[in-house]
Amino acid sequence: IDTENLATQIAHRVGVSKAEMETLIESIPQHLAPLKGTVKILSDLKSAGHDLFFLSNMPASYAHYLESTHDFFQYFSDGLFSARVQCIKPSAKIFEMANNKFKVSGKNTIFIDDVKHNVEAAELHGWAGIWFQSPTQLRQTLVNSQLLKA
């Protein structure tokens, strides 16, 4: 979704003007940063030999900002930003797009997300799912699953 459409949808829901919402949306990117500990998990997964891909429900302006200011994208082989493919999680279509683009499928594909219904959608699609709640919880889950060493 682009900034204009996002602003229109949110403004309508919360009762503010579209212009006010656009201003707010445009001010957010500089505040985006990875959670402490998550980049280390990406690095460790990559070092363990896992191919990493991302699916992100993010407006195009946020995606561009993150790509140009953060180096954690180096750990990913590829990814999909919803704004660029005009499809969002939890739509089954975005998981199909990912299967085709990344050449992945089935239980060997592990989907990690902080939104439970997105994880459930991935599981319905046949992927294994991990509901992210904190870096500590994620690391422990990955260790328990033998995807990372303790």
Where are these predicted regions, by residue range?
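Conserved phosphate-coupling serine/threonine residues in phosphotransfer and NTP-handling enzymes
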Residues: S56
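Hydrophobic alpha-helical core bundles mediating ligand binding, dimerization, or RNAP-core interactions
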Residues: L6-I10, I25-I28, P59-L66
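Helix-loop "lid/cap" segments that line or gate small-molecule binding pockets
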Residues: I1-V16
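Amphipathic alpha-helical interaction elements
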Residues: V16, Q30, W127-I130
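Short, acidic loop-to-helix structural element flanking the phosphoryl-transfer center
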Residues: E4-N5, A19-F53, A92
